[in-house]
Structures are given as C-alpha cells and as structure tokens.
C-alpha cells in the first residue's frame, strides 16, 4: 500500500514557473487591451448623458415656445417643466461642475435659443434652435463661450 502511494506521488506533476509566467503574461495583455476600451466607453457614456440632458432641456424650451411663441431664460419655468435638471442663466458652461447643469445661454426675441451643458468627460455640448431654422448642434473640448465662433452642424 505504501509503495503505491509513493509511485502515485512520483506521477503527480505541477505547473512549472515558465507556465505560470506565460499565464500571467497573457492575463496582463488582456488587461492592457481591456482598460483603454473600458475608459473609452466610459467617456462616450458621459458625453451621451450630457447630450441627453440637453435634449430634455430643449424639449422643455419647446414646450414654452409652443405655449408662448417665444423661448425663455426663466429657470423656474424650465424647472417646472423638467425638474430633473439644474438650469443656470448665462454662458458659463466652461465652469460647470454638475453634469445635470444646463446653461440657458440666450433666448432672443427673434426666436433663437442656445442651451449648453458640460459632460463629466470635460466636453461641452450646445444646442441652438431658431423659429425659422432647424436645430443645430456644436461641441467643444475647450468649452468656448457661445459668443466665440462655434461650428454649428446638424448633429453632434
């Protein structure tokens, strides 16, 4: 009986140091690939959150426009329509620290409104609408004020 146990022990094999190092190397390579992908997905998600918040704020502005035929900068009115966002008057989008802060930059008597918001990734997004023109979009990583030249397009 003892002889059989000794023979069985000799037949047992473990992993060599080289095999363990190869496994560790493979895991390290997979992690090196996965982390940048994860971080990119996180940035895109933060940007989409800011864009979604802007679209919701814009829908609130459209409700006001439908009722009054003019856009508003009145943050209390907008909060009454869409209370999940924090409305701020002014063009200080670059100073935003709250992802739910929507800056009502302008609401002109000519029927133009500009809304701005900043994502947690640091990119600022803007929406502009005019009574006589389609909605336009802009984004800026430097968070320029609207008074400066932004490139307005039909999509972000």
Range-by-range predicted roles:
Residues 37-54, 68-69:
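Aliphatic-rich helix starts adjacent to a transmembrane/signal segment
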Residues 11-38:
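N-terminal single-pass transmembrane signal-anchor helix
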Residues 7, 40, 76:
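Phosphate-coordinating loops and pocket residues in cytosolic domains that bind phosphorylated ligands
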Residues 1-15:
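N-terminal leader/signal peptides at the extreme start of proteins
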Residues 59-156:
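Periplasmic/extracellular, small/polar-rich flexible segments of pilin-like filament-forming proteins
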Residues 14-16, 47, 51-56, 63:
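Extracytoplasmic/periplasmic mature domains of Sec-exported, cell-envelope-associated bacterial proteins
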């Amino acid at each position: 009986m003892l002889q059989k146990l000794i023979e069985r022990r000799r037949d047992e094999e473990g992993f060599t140091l080289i095999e363990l190092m190869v496994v560790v190397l493979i895991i390290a390579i997979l992690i090196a690939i996965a982390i940048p992908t994860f971080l990119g997905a996180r940035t895109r998600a933060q940007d989409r959150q800011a864009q979604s918040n802007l679209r919701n704020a814009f829908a609130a502005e459209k409700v006001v426009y439908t009722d009054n035929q003019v856009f508003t900068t009145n943050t209390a009115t907008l909060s009454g329509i869409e209370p999940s966002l924090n409305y701020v008057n002014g063009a200080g989008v670059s100073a935003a620290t709250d992802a739910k802060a929507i800056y009502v930059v302008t609401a002109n008597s000519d029927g133009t409104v500009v809304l701005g918001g900043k994502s947690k990734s640091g990119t600022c997004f803007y929406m502009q609408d005019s009574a006589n023109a389609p909605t336009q979009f802009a984004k800026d990583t430097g968070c320029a004020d609207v008074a400066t030249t932004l490139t307005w397009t039909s999509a972000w």
